[in-house]
Amino acid sequence: VYTNPLPTNWGSDRGLTDPRSVNVKIQHSFIQMPENQYQPRFEDVRVGYFTTQVTDMTTPDDATPYRDLIHRWNLVKKNPDQGISEPIEPIVWWIENTTPLEFRGAIQEGVLAWNKAFEQAGFHNAVQVKVQPDDAAWDAGDIRYNVLRWTSSPNPPFGGYGPSFVNPKTGQILGAD
């Protein structure tokens, strides 16, 4: 015999009545993939990259029909005929407003030091750094912004971790934290 008893907890605007419960807020963000002239690059196993694996079915006899696309930013020169040019769209990093004031200058200096490497690749001022305003209308978790976050931990890991999200078809970095 099948029975379907009525629920005994009809809910509340104050959350669940069970003291073992926790409220969790979840947000899903969707973005449209860019339509541009970005050219994917395949991994060279001699160099370490973050990669996205894609299946390549164009060679039927290939025992390993997959390729690894490297994750990289889509930097395009404003002036392609110049040796060094500013990019059309620079990589903009935001220092989260919760970062202690005494560390912000050093963090900004460290990030901007990457411009030296980008100059070797032909880009001037490829990386910019801004500080999230205290009254920002956007959250540090907003995927439209590349945010350097400050976290405190009793057991801090060595260094940092920089997750990014990419176009799965090309490996183009669309954003990062």
Residue map of PLM features:
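Auxiliary tRNA-acceptor-end handling modules of aminoacyl-tRNA synthetases
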Residues: 1-99, 108, 117, 121, ...
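Extended non-catalytic domains of envelope/secretory-pathway proteins
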Residues: 105-109, 113
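Conserved structured catalytic cores and adjacent interaction surfaces
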Residues: 127
